[in-house]
A protein has these predicted regions:
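Bacterial N-terminal signal peptides that target proteins for export
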Residues: 2-13
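C-terminal motif of bacterial Sec signal peptides marking the signal peptidase cleavage site
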Residues: 21-23
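Sequence/structural signature of beta-propeller domains
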Residues: 25-312
Length: 312
């Protein structure tokens, strides 16, 4: 990837190499069992001092790149190519196990997305019909599956090699989605319909079998845990759809929000646009212990974003 004359602690060609190789090679098969306990992540060598970089999809279907400490400075802007006519992307994320950027469309088609060229390549022939609305998506690093949340409590997983729906209940005929999103009994918002439009998983460097699925409720403006915190008992799977509120972001209700957690540092970042008229998109750092958001700056010229992904 070109660094666009921005100073970096990594050589330019070395920084570009992982993405270039990932986009030009065949993706190896992932574990077929969704509850696989095998590590999905090969060893990666990275500079701990490198600035956190993000890719984002704009509402005008452009792929932009910027750094967390200077979000206003757009380092790359590329028109996204290969999307079916009338379709739009609803989110992006890097597949932790392979370092490949994935995108999901409103029509339920999964793609790989070239991080420099902005070109899409379809994965399979369409995984699932999606309702209209805002979606969250993020790869679970322990089992290499793509979590998708959306309107009406939608909660499902997609297989990254086929784009197909992962069966949420093998005991029932046909393919089932996972349990509907709902706030747990005793939660401050129990009985209220969630509006989870952003999700992200942590990465545990000491034990890669552990992860926590965090979620942001756009209507409430709150951070929640989907399932249970890693290494706590009893363990509750995100597949149940059970939500436990962490706390408010401190921003009020949101027009849109995108969310990701770094698999290097577990830094949690969210791109947020408030309900205020003509509100720009700001980048925030999220405290996973409290939910509180700390502003880092406006992203570019403040345009609306449909998804962000922290670069590996």
């Amino acid at each position: 990837m070109l660094r666009m004359s921005l100073p970096s602690s990594r050589p330019l060609w070395l920084a570009a190499l992982p993405w270039a190789l990932a986009a030009c090679t065949n993706v190896p098969s992932a574990p077929t069992a969704d509850n696989s306990s095998a590590s999905a992540r090969p060893g990666l060598v990275r500079s701990a001092k490198a600035a956190t970089e993000l890719l984002a999809v704009t509402a005008s279907m452009e792929l932009i790149r910027f750094q967390a400490d200077q979000p206003r400075q757009i380092l790359q802007r590329q028109r996204i190519q290969g999307l079916a006519k009338g379709d739009t992307l609803v989110g992006i994320d890097f597949r932790v196990a392979r370092g490949v950027l994935y995108a999901l469309s409103q029509q339920g088609q999964l793609y790989t997305l070239h991080p420099q060229q902005g070109t899409l390549q379809a994965v399979g022939t369409g995984g699932v019909a999606l309702p209209t609305g805002s979606f969250g998506l993020d790869f679970n690093p322990t089992v290499d599956r793509l979590r998708v949340t959306g309107p009406g409590g939608l909660n499902l997983r997609l297989h990254p090699d086929t784009g197909a729906l992962v069966d949420g209940d093998a005991q029932q005929p046909g393919l089932q989605t996972d349990g509907r999103l709902h706030y747990a009994t005793g939660d401050a918002y129990a009985g209220r319909q969630p509006d989870i439009s952003a999700v992200a998983y942590t990465y545990n460097a000491q034990n890669n079998q552990l992860t926590t699925n965090y979620a942001i409720d756009k209507t409430l403006g709150t951070l929640a845990v989907q399932g249970s915190l890693e290494a706590t008992q009893p363990q509750i799977s995100p597949n149940t759809g059970q939500l436990h509120t962490v706390g408010p972001l401190g921003l009020g209700p949101l027009a849109d929000v995108s969310f990701d957690i770094s698999d290097v540092s577990n830094q949690a970042l969210a791109a947020v646009r408030s309900l205020s008229p003509s509100a720009p998109t700001h980048l925030y750092q999220i405290d996973l212990a409290t939910g509180r958001a700390r502003m880092l700056g406006v992203v570019g010229d403040g345009e609306a974003l449909l998804g962000i992904a922290i670069a590996p």
